[in-house]
C-alpha cells in the first residue's frame, strides 16, 4: 500500500485500515507459530504498512 493512497483517506478510514492490518498481522503470526506460513515476507510487509498508517494518523493529529 502506497503512502499517497493512504494520504487521501480520512482519519476514520485510516483507523479502520489499521484495525484490519493488526488483525492480518495477528493471523500471520499465528500461522508462523503453527508453521503454516509459506511466505514469511508478508509479516514484514504488514508491519511496514502498520507503521505507514500510524505515521499518517500522527501527522493528521499534529496538523489539527
Swiss-Prot record:
Keyword Hydrolase found: no
One example GO MF annotation: structural constituent of ribosome
Top-level taxon: Bacteria
InterPro entries per record: Ribosomal_protein_uL29, Ribosomal_uL29, Ribosomal_uL29_CS, Ribosomal_uL29_sf
Annotated GO CC locations: cytosolic large ribosomal subunit
Originating organism: Aromatoleum aromaticum (strain DSM 19018 / LMG 30748 / EbN1) (Azoarcus sp. (strain EbN1))
Cysteine disulfide partners in this protein: none
Keywords: Ribonucleoprotein, Ribosomal protein
PANTHER family per record: 60S RIBOSOMAL PROTEIN L35/50S RIBOSOMAL PROTEIN L29, LARGE RIBOSOMAL SUBUNIT PROTEIN UL29C
GO biological process: translation
A Pfam family that the UniProt record links to this protein: Ribosomal_L29
Membership in a protein family: Belongs to the universal ribosomal protein uL29 family.
Keyword Nucleotidyltransferase: no
The protein's name in its UniProt record: Large ribosomal subunit protein uL29
Transmembrane region(s): none
Amino acid at each position: 500500500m502506497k503512502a499517497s493512497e493512504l494520504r487521501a483517506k480520512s482519519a476514520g478510514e485510516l483507523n479502520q485500515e489499521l484495525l484490519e492490518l493488526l488483525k492480518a498481522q495477528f493471523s500471520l503470526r499465528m500461522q508462523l507459530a503453527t508453521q503454516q506460513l509459506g511466505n514469511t515476507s508478508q509479516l514484514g510487509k504488514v508491519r511496514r504498512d502498520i507503521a505507514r498508517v500510524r505515521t499518517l494518523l500522527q501527522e493528521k493529529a499534529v496538523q489539527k
